[in-house]
Design a protein with these regions (language model features):
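Short intrinsically disordered, low-complexity coil segments enriched in acidic
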Residues: 1-2, 263
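Long, non-catalytic protein-protein interaction scaffolds
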Residues: 2-200
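Structured, charged N-terminal subsegments at the starts of enzyme catalytic cores
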Residues: 177-263
């Protein structure tokens, strides 16, 4: 009996402090089949084809982010007060070919495996085969890492002595700082302009590298503000057509917030 009570306890806790709106959004997320979403990989490929070789690596990555945030599909689902999705809806999972360029077989495994399945369509497989793999197969970080390792290292890896070491993904860590609560990205851009003004190209051998990094930061902040503005504009368009007074008011609030955040 005691064991049974412990098993049921999370359900009791779940019922407290959860509004109907949050419960509905949570159920929508939990009940949606995760799926691969190819848009990011395609937009990133476009950006690299356009900019690679014309700018520094930091600037290339920043321009890619700006291209992606300017072009990616965005949506706001009813009841959401915090907006933003990785894909076009709940549980749509983008791929990151710059880190790891999956083979078609990899994607078939994702679609067919029993645990943590990601649905993959025939169109996804076609785009991966014809568009993504030809460009990214030998450009990905994972390919570069594995190509640099000794045969002994590869043998140990294949034997499972060690496995995932983030060669297929970014760490995803966030620097512990409260600056984002005090300053917007437009403020950070002012900091960058001052830093660029202070660069000493005559005496500092690192000045050019610093300029490239600062320039990339400036572009990345533009990208983030572009995305925020797009969500604000979408919320305002949706509010103009909404008949539910509460949701209409929420959309206007979202639009007002996105007009100043993250800028």
């Amino acid at each position: 009996m005691a064991v049974q009570e412990r098993v049921q306890e999370p359900r009791v806790q779940e019922a407290h402090g959860v509004t109907e709106r949050v419960r509905r959004l949570r159920e929508e997320s939990l009940n949606t089949q995760p799926r691969i979403y190819m848009e990011r990989a395609l937009l990133e490929t476009e950006a690299y084809e356009q900019y690679e070789g014309t700018v520094s690596v930091p600037e290339l990555r920043a321009l890619t982010l700006r291209h992606y945030f300017s072009k990616k599909s965005i949506s706001i689902h009813k009841g959401e007060l915090i907006v933003g999705e990785k894909g076009d809806g709940p549980q749509s999972a983008p791929t990151f070919p710059e880190l790891c360029c999956h083979t078609v077989e990899d994607m078939k495994v994702m679609d067919q495996r029993e645990l943590i399945r990601f649905a993959v369509t025939e169109e996804d497989l076609r785009l991966q085969q014809e568009r993504v793999i030809p460009f990214w197969e030998k450009r990905s970080i994972r390919h570069r890492i594995l190509s640099s390792m000794s045969e002994e290292w590869k043998a140990a890896y294949e034997c499972g002595i060690f496995t995932e070491f983030m060669e297929q993904r970014g760490p995803g860590h966030t620097v512990g700082s409260d600056k984002i609560y005090q300053k917007g990205f437009a403020d950070y851009q002012e900091d960058i302009r001052r830093a660029m003004k202070d660069l000493d190209f005559l005496r500092d051998p690192e000045a050019l590298r610093k300029k490239e990094e600062l320039s990339a930061m400036m572009i990345a902040y533009d990208a983030i503000m572009i995305l925020g503005k797009r969500y604000g504009e979408l919320a305002r368009r949706m509010a103009a057509e909404e008949t539910d007074p509460q949701w209409r008011a929420d959309l206007f609030t979202i639009a007002e917030n996105c007009a100043v955040v993250p800028a």
